[in-house]
């Protein structure tokens, strides 16, 4: 899943190489997600997009970059230890300054989800991580689950998204779960 492998392949392939998914980025998912958001909301510019969970890896990174480039307001709502890489955050803030987007990081769920247009989450344990991290992640990220309270704090028209596969749900909709 290494980004370096895709970059090396692209360097020597002699043909275009598309990054379907690496540990750092997931551009294929971005195309699908942005089309879905546009389909449901009618636009992308100015959309408040909240990512809840572990924002350090491919989904958090890709969503932050994509939102910055498309003029969307990105919020990583998670524990500080799961904030995205500072260097990438700085890059995204520079891009956001040119597109009218904004980039915010918060540990406060009420602040982060307030008036959100989109609330998005991902698996809490990423591909290739050892089983030993499960207990810590569940403890750390449980306050950042997308549930009824988080969705109620968003706009009434807000949509919930997940890049799949999603596991451990007790309800088919976050609007129904506690």
Where are each of the predicted segments found?
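Structural alpha-helical scaffold elements that stabilize or flank donor/cofactor-binding regions
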Residues: 111-112
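Glycine-rich phosphate/diphosphate-binding loop of Rossmann-like nucleotide-binding domains
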Residues: 45-104
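Phosphate/diphosphate ligand-binding glycine-rich loop within oxidoreductases
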Residues: 1-38, 168
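Glycine/threonine-rich flexible loop motifs
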Residues: 126-144
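Conserved small/polar residues in nucleotide/adenosyl-binding loops
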Residues: 169-176
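An anion/phosphate-binding loop that grips the pyrophosphate of nucleotide cofactors and donors
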Residues: 116
């Amino acid at each position: 899943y290494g980004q370096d492998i895709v970059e090396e392949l692209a360097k020597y392939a002699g043909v275009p190489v598309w990054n379907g998914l690496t540990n750092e980025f997931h551009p294929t998912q971005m195309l699908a997600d942005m089309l879905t958001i546009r389909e449901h909301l009618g636009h992308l510019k100015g959309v408040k997009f909240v990512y809840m969970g572990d924002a350090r890896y491919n989904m958090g990174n890709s969503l932050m970059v994509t939102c910055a480039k498309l003029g969307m307001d990105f919020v990583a709502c998670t524990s500080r230890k799961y904030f995205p890489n500072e260097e990438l955050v700085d890059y995204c803030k520079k891009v956001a300054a040119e597109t009218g987007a904004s980039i915010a990081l918060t540990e406060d769920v009420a602040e982060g989800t307030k008036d959100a247009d989109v609330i998005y989450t991902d698996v809490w344990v990423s591909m290739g991580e050892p089983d030993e991290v499960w207990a810590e992640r569940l403890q750390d990220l449980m306050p950042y689950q997308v549930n009824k309270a988080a969705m109620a704090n968003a706009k009434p028209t807000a949509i919930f998204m997940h890049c799949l596969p999603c596991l451990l749900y007790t309800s088919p909709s976050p609007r129904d779960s506690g």
